[in-house]
Amino acid sequence: MIIFQDLISHNEMFSDIYKIWEITNGLCLEVEQKMLSKTTGNTDDSLIGRNSSSESTEDEVTESTIITSVDIVTNHHLQESIFTKEAYKKYIKDYMKSINEKLEEQRPERVKLFITGMKNKSSTSLLIFKTTSSLLVKT
């Protein structure tokens, strides 16, 4: 299994168990996600070896809770971030600057492609800012 890490923080982001597409000429990765529902608190009597007919005749009420989340968030301990539009712009600008510096050190031939590709990508991400949530790795 391949674990993808953030270039700057080196924190785990996702693994290759998900469908992954390269977008923006290979500058970004898009990862497929699915919604999961998990029920907690309701245990089936057969799983614990309890014979309900020989025990109490009273009906016992057990509470159960259904938790719905995105699989990649749950499996890789990501946290939803809450940004204002201005804070998001600043965060993206600082993050892109950090990536640019890393590219200059490690792969200088990709710097120009990165700068032009990210100008287009960051303006697109600002357009869809209101309809999506941003996820950050848990540190």
From Swiss-Prot:
Signal peptide: none
Residue ranges, compositional bias (Polar residues): 40-51
Provenance organism: Homo sapiens (Human)
Family: Belongs to the TCTP family.
Keywords for this protein: Apoptosis
A single GO cellular-component term on record: cytoplasm
Domain TCTP: 1-139
Region listing for Disordered, in residue ranges: 40-60
Name of the gene encoding the protein in the UniProt record: TPT1P8
SUPFAM superfamilies, alphabetized: Mss4-like
Protein name per its UniProtKB record: Putative translationally-controlled tumor protein-like protein TPT1P8
Matches recorded under PROSITE patterns: TCTP_3
GO function term, MF aspect, one: calcium ion binding
Gene Ontology biological process: apoptotic process
